[in-house]
Amino acid sequence: MENKEGIPRHVGIVMDGNGRWAKERGLPRIMGHHAGVRTVEEIGIAARDLGVSHLSLYAFSTENWKRPKGEVMGLMGLFRYYVRGKISAMNRDNMRMRFAGRLVDLPEDVQDILHEAEEQTGNNTGMDLIFCINYGGRQEILDGINRALASGKTEFASEDDLRPYLYLPDVPDPDLLIRTGGELRMSNFWLWSGAYSEYYFSDKYWPDFDAQELKKAIESYARRERRYGTA
C-alpha cells in the first residue's frame, strides 16, 4: 500500500557497513556504529518529510550475539544512550518509537528503556520509527506460531490467521526494503511481511547513506509496477 505520488508507506532498511566503514578509517568497529546513529537521524527526518508513514531499521539481529563480546556490549550501550535521548525529540516531532524482536532476551535495563520510549511516544500520530532489535524473520514466524498455539489456536485457514501473533501486527507490510553496504541479500529481515516487497541495494556503507540516496531508492521504487503475481 502506498501514500500519494508513489511514496512507499513502509520502508525497511538493513543498515549494513558500519564495521567496514570504521575499518577503512582505522577505527574500532563500535565507532562505525556511532557514526551510523547520525545516519539514523538524517534518514528518519528525510523519510518523514518524503511522506513515509513507517520506517523500520534492522538494528540488531538474533545472529548478532555471535559478534565479539565487546562489540555487543557497545551496541547495548548505544541502544541505552540513543533511545533514552531520543524520546523528547520524537514527542516534539509527533513521531512514535516502536520495537520489534525478542526483546525479552535483551538486558533488563535495555528492555525498560525500550518500553518507556514506546509508552511516552505512543500517543503521537506521525511517522512510526521502528527499530528491529534482537530480530530474526524466522524467529518471528516461530514465535508467532507458538503464541497462537498458546492461545488455543490449532489451525490456520489462511495466512491472515497468523498475522495477529506476529511482532507488530498493525504495521503494514514493507513496500520497499533497502540494504546498504553492497551485499545482495536481506539477512532474515521481514521474511513474512516482506514477501512482496521491492528491493533496493546501495553500495554505500550505512554511515555514508544520506537523504539523497534514500530519495534515489524511493524514485526507483516509484518507477516499478507491482503485480503481486498477476499478469
Where are these regions (language model features)?
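Flexible, compositionally biased loop and terminal segments
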Residues: 1-231
